[in-house]
A protein has these predicted regions:
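A Rossmann-like FAD-binding core segment of flavoenzymes
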Residues: 38, 77-89, 97, 177-279, ...
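Rossmann-like dinucleotide-binding core of oxidoreductases
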Residues: 150-217, 225-227, 316-353
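FAD-binding core/adjacent interface of flavoenzyme oxidoreductases
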Residues: 3-12, 79-171, 178-184, 254
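Beta1-alpha1 glycine-rich phosphate/pyrophosphate-binding loop at the start
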Residues: 8-81, 161-205
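Glycine-rich, N-terminal phosphate-binding loop of Rossmann-like dinucleotide-binding domains
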Residues: 18, 101, 113-114, 244, ...
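FAD-site-proximal beta/loop scaffold in flavoenzymes
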Residues: 126-151, 249-252, 256-322
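C-terminal, flexible cofactor-proximal segment of oxidoreductases
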Residues: 328-409
């Protein structure tokens, strides 16, 4: 009896980056493609980190172990190969990714690399201001706050010119204000908020109904001084110098610098990218020039639908849209493997706005049918009782991610 072996040509997709967008894209593609798809995720960190909860780490409300887990076991369970390596560059003509652990060939490439933080945006930002956006930065802030309380002074919190992640800085501001009251030193501290935004509550999304009025009310209620439409000229050991010439004394400074594209993109001469290192994509998240290259999450170039008045700033790229773009990419690679040409499209600005801004055991719920205007509905709802929703979203997303339930919202 003759036995005929049927050879099934597997499609290999390499995903660079293992945070919200990368994890979702990899697991969703494997779930849809099953044995016909080989999916490899390359990341330099063994841990998945729920970044939105970093704002609680300086205040000991969370430890890093509470908001992170090893990703390899989850990926393996879902059939995704994990490679702990740093991606160095890609040759899109040869379809080869070079890492510090060797080269990887691909049929499709998904770039979900997250950001590089531009600390050199102004003199002194790297040396004298803190940054809440990394585990190391959050732990340094914890140490700085514990020293600060021994000899309180003015605090400056905010965002630099070109920044897009204003929301996390707002959250840190209100958490610091609550912490100062808990430490019984609030009356000894002048608290300043500085932002390039045209107005309070712009958030890089052109604002929300009643948002400016609400935040102005918070600033009055908590006695926080604020400056809008300002850039950072320089940060020193004990001051922040604004573009207006004003000098704010500061014993502790926390600023959100801009995000730019990672070195992997900049090192890849055959990969067309924008001047700031992001990937130009169609509404399907396929590269505008290279048919088998895709991008998801922060790596995506998002064009601003508004003009900044005086100081340039950007738009936020948060976990929910990153997760959504990862799903779109997975669906489209799967469709192409099926011979389909009808790609799913979901422009970044049309992704629903779903955000909870923590305000020091209080919260503001932000909902809209799309991130950018025009919107059918948009709502900012304060919850002054407790930050139930923020905690629930953290617990839900960690549960979902630890189990690899990538198809869930």
């Amino acid at each position: 009896m003759q036995v005929h072996l049927i050879h099934i040509e597997m499609i290999k997709t390499v995903v660079i980056g293992g945070s919200f967008a990368g994890m979702t894209a990899a697991m969703e593609l494997k779930r849809k493609g099953k044995e016909k798809h080989e999916v490899v995720l390359i990341d330099k960190s063994p841990l998945f980190l729920f970044i939105p909860s970093l704002i609680w780490v300086p205040f000991r409300r969370r430890e890093l172990k509470d908001i992170s887990f090893k990703k390899e076991a989850v990926l393996k369970k879902r059939g995704v190969d994990f490679v702990l390596a740093e991606a160095i560059s890609v040759d899109t003509k040869l379809n080869v990714v070079t890492t510090d652990k060797g080269d990887f060939h691909y049929d499709h490439l998904v770039i979900a690399t997250g950001p590089k933080v531009q600390f050199d945006i102004a003199p002194g930002v790297a040396e004298y201001s803190h940054y809440i956006g990394t585990p190391n930065g959050a732990m340094k802030l914890r140490s700085a706050l514990e020293e600060f309380v021994k000899n309180p002074g003015p605090i400056v919190i905010g965002a630099t010119q070109n920044a897009g992640c204003m929301g996390a800085a707002y959250e840190f501001l209100f958490n610091v204000e609550k912490w100062l009251r808990d430490q019984k030193v609030r009356k000894k501290v002048d608290l300043y908020w500085v932002t390039p935004e045209d107005y309070l509550g712009h958030f890089g999304i052109d604002g929300m109904p009643m948002g400016e009025a609400m935040l102005k009310g918070f600033m009055r209620m908590f006695n926080i001084h604020y400056r809008t439409q300002v850039a950072i000229k320089e940060v020193t050991a004990d001051s922040v110098i604004l573009s207006t010439g004003e000098v704010l004394k500061s014993s502790l400074t926390q600023l959100m610098p801009p995000f730019i594209g990672v070195d992997f993109v900049r090192n890849s001469s055959s990969l067309p990218s924008t001047p700031n290192g992001y990937i130009p994509v169609e509404d399907s998240y396929r590269h505008k020039e290279i048919a088998n290259v895709w991008a998801a999450g922060i790596a995506v170039q998002v064009d601003l639908p508004f003009e900044c008045k005086n100081i340039p700033y950007s738009t936020p790229k948060t976990g929910y849209p990153s997760d959504e773009t990862g799903k779109v990419v997975a669906e489209n690679i799967f469709r192409i493997s099926q011979g389909r040409t009808d790609l799913k499209e979901k422009p970044w600005g049309k992704i629903p706005g779903l955000c909870v801004m923590d305000a020091g055991k209080k919260e503001v719920l932000i909902f809209s049918n799309s991130l950018f205007r025009p919107r059918v509905f948009a709502l900012m709802l304060p919850n002054v009782i407790y930050d139930f929703t923020k905690v629930f979203i953290e617990k839900y997303f960690l549960w979902k991610s630890k189990h690899g339930y990538s198809w869930l919202p």
